[in-house]
UniProtKB/Swiss-Prot annotation:
Residues 1-15 form the signal peptide. It comes from Mus musculus. Ca(2+) 2 binds at residues 131-132, 134, 149-150, 153. Residues 438-680 form the Peptidase S1 domain. Ca(2+) 1 binds at residues 60, 68, 113. Glycans are attached at residues 174, 641. Core component of the complement C1 complex, a calcium-dependent complex composed of 1 molecule of the C1Q subcomplex, 2 molecules of C1R and 2 molecules of C1S. The C1Q subcomplex is composed 18 subunits: 3 chains of C1QA, C1QB, and C1QC trimerize to form 6 collagen-like triple helices connected to six globular ligand-recognition modules. This is Complement C1s-1 subcomponent. Its main location: secreted.
Length: 688
């Protein structure tokens, strides 16, 4: 292996005699290397002279061509030396310099020194044996660019950056493969504004980042392409093709298409096709990248922020639903969402819509119902009703609910709180037809006294005052905290009680001023004989079960002698035995003095020891009275000043000296504050 470092390269070229040839400087048409000496020995057949001519000379200029040069030597004599940048003396001829020699041998020597400050491409020369000139002696030019004559023929050649097609006559240009990625630029046909090459296909690509569309702008005067033929076909044409559409082909003098082409694509292909003829200057265009725009799509029932006339790539908007509408994604809902203008001109989240808020199925309520709506969306109105006549709406305007913007059912008065159906008090299903009193009274239906509570142990009565509370006498519960109670039954026969509604006590509250005694049989003080039983579960009201009203605190609820009230129960009769079926009677109020005058039946108690207070009511008449087993039952009076008769509990059966005469009743009006306070302080969460 030879390893040489050469600062000067000497090369020579010689061959058998030929009729023609080509001589090119090293690396032509690229820049020639430094420090080179290369020679060519030209020889044509005997009898021919040599015609040597240069078509390209671009050699470092110097005085007398002392640095770089190409020498023409004939017979040892220098016939010429060339350097510098030379051009053709005639625009119609590619020949820059030419030499003719009568002899058939010639030497060409190219020399370059050790350095060049600029880029020089060297030279291109051709030689022929002198004979006829096919390139000039005929009318038709055989070559599209350069014609080179030789004895017996010719050959065609092309200028730099061109190539010779397979037909060996026409030159084309290598103008494909350029890719433009800058957001702004300019593209023109080859040689513009000089004539473009014939028989060529130039392909260019504009590729911008996603989110930008290619916008092409043309000036009519910057377009000069061979016009269409009589049938409208373009022999030479310029065509644009984006992803989804094509623009063109275009040809003619002056651009015939729109001067601004918006492609709606970030890529654009440009094809310039020419045929074998033509001498037009071509075209020049400018392009830039314009952010892709997204159309403002009006989403129903929403607002856009910011609100602009035009939205472009990467713009973000907040879409907020108007009141009563929401966006639902899976199981998550919200009142707004964000959308971004994407690179394809479409909005992200375009599938989201503002739809009416869904409130769901209205919650049920105890002792009432709600109409089933056709739908449960914003603006829908539903109505709650109670199971009349046994329940009524606690708030008169509390039945109408509207599906609100927050997705909740809302009432103008109660807000989101559900309406409450409370028992209607004091209205018996069947009014009691009075004939006589309990003691020797008359049979009654439970529908006459639906508030009647039967205490089986101890045997007594009570009054249902709402769904969770029973009012009775304190002495009934003095020795027991878990009474056995029933409602809704006329008969207290053991077998029939199984079908009655049993009440379970949660807690017993005896009035704090009630005085306990060890022996109830000797009690003489029944002051504050009142108690409350709180129930574990609410009582279901109906035709046989409903509460009695509490008295008001006004003077209208004061009872006076002569006023008639109703009593009921399962106490003993004139025969001294407990009854099985409910009995009722109507009794008048008398003065307390009347009760004081009753003869005592119990010999162990002195009559003067009995205590009479303003907390007591005396009522009854001979043969008409409550008795043992009726204790705690209601002494009912009609509520004053009402259109539909209803009853309130004015008194509770408390005590008496002798059955069948006059009895003493606890005056409930004096205890209303205690009753309400006790119920309020001990009411837990409602089971609505």
């Amino acid at each position: 292996m030879w390893c040489l470092v050469l600062f000067s390269l000497l090369a020579s070229f010689s061959a058998e005699p030929t009729m023609h040839g080509e001589i090119l400087s090293p690396n032509y048409p690229q820049a020639y290397p430094n420090d080179v000496v290369k020679s060519w020995d030209i020889e044509v057949p005997e009898g021919f002279g040599i015609h040597l001519y240069f078509t390209h000379v671009d050699i470092e200029p110097s005085e007398s061509c002392a640095y770089d040069s190409v020498q023409i030597i004939s017979g040892g004599i220098e016939e010429g030396r060339l350097c510098g940048q030379k051009t053709s003396k005639s625009p119609n001829s590619p020949i820059i310099e030419e030499f003719q020699f009568p002899y058939n041998k010639l030497q060409v020597v190219f020399t370059s020194d050790f350095s060049n400050e600029e880029r020089f491409t060297g030279f291109a020369a051709y030689y022929t044996a002198i004979d006829i000139n096919e390139c000039t002696d005929f009318t038709d030019v055989p070559c599209s660019h350069f014609c080179n004559n030789f004895i017996g023929g010719y050959f065609c050649s092309c200028p730099p950056e061109y190539f010779l097609h397979d037909d060996m006559r026409n030159c084309g240009v290598n103008c494909s493969g350029d890719v433009f990625t800058a957001l702004i630029g300019e593209i023109s046909s080859p040689n513009y504004p000089n004539p473009y090459p014939e028989n060529s296909r130039c392909e260019y690509q504009i590729q911008l980042q996603e989110g930008f569309q290619v916008v092409v702008t043309m000036q009519r005067e910057d377009f000069d392409v061979e016009p269409a033929d009589s049938e409208g076909n373009c022999p030479d044409s310029l065509t644009f093709a984006s992803k989804n559409q094509q623009f063109g082909p275009y040809c003619g003098n002056g651009f015939p298409g729109p001067l601004t082409i918006r492609t709606q694509s970030n890529t654009l292909g440009i094809v310039f096709q020419t045929d074998l003829m033509g001498q037009k200057k071509g075209w020049k265009l400018r392009y830039h990248g314009d952010p892709i725009s997204c159309a403002k799509k009006i989403t129903a029932n929403s607002t856009w922020e910011p609100d602009k006339a035009k939205y472009v790539f990467k713009d973000v908007v907040k879409i907020t639903c108007v009141d009563g509408f929401e966006v639902v994604e899976g199981h998550v809902s919200s009142t707004s969402y964000y959308s971004t203008c994407q690179s394809d001109g479409q909005w992200s989240n375009s599938g989201l819509k503002c739809q009416p808020v869904y409130c769901g199925i209205p919650d049920p309520i105890a002792n009432g119902k709600v109409e089933e709506p056709e739908n449960s969306v914003f603006g829908t109105v539903v109505h709650y009703t109670c199971e009349e006549p046994y329940y009524y709406m606690e708030h008169e305007e509390g039945g109408e609910y509207r599906c609100a913007a927050n997705g909740r059912w809302v009432n103008d008065q109660l807000g989101i709180e559900l309406p409450r159906c409370i028992p209607a008090c004091g209205v018996p299903t069947e009014p009691f037809q009075v004939h006589q009193r309990i003691f020797g009274g008359q049979p009654a239906k439970i529908e006459n006294f639906p508030w009647q509570v039967f205490f089986n142990h101890p045997r007594a009565s009570g009054a249902l005052i709402n769904e969770y509370w029973v009012l009775t006498a304190a002495h009934v519960l003095e020795k027991i905290s878990d009474p056995l109670m029933y409602v809704g039954t006329m008969s207290v026969r053991t077998t029939l009680l199984e079908n009655a509604q049993r009440l379970y006590s949660k807690r017993v509250f005896i009035h704090p001023s009630w005085k306990k005694e060890d022996d109830p049989n000797t009690r003489t003080n029944f002051d504050n004989d009142i108690a409350l039983v709180q129930l574990k579960d609410p009582v279901k009201m109906g035709p046989k079960v409903s509460p009695i009203c509490l008295p008001g605190t006004s003077s209208e609820y004061n009872v006076s002698p002569g006023d008639m009230g109703l009593i009921s129960g399962w106490g003993s009769t004139e025969k001294k035995v407990f009854v099985i079926n409910l009995r009722g009677a109507k009794v008048p109020v008398t003065s307390l003095e009347t009760c004081k005058q009753v003869k005592e039946e119990n010999p162990t108690v002195r009559p003067e020891d009995y205590v009479f207070t303003d907390n007591m009511i005396c009522a009854g008449e001979k043969g008409v009275d409550s008795c043992h087993g009726d204790s705690g039952g209601a002494f009912a009076f009609q509520v004053p000043n009402v259109t539909v008769p209803k009853f309130y509990v004015a008194g509770l059966v408390s005590w008496g000296k002798r059955c069948g005469t006059y009895g003493v009743y606890t005056k409930v009006k004096n205890y209303v504050d205690w009753i309400l306070k006790t119920m309020q302080e001990n009411s837990g969460p409602r089971k609505d």
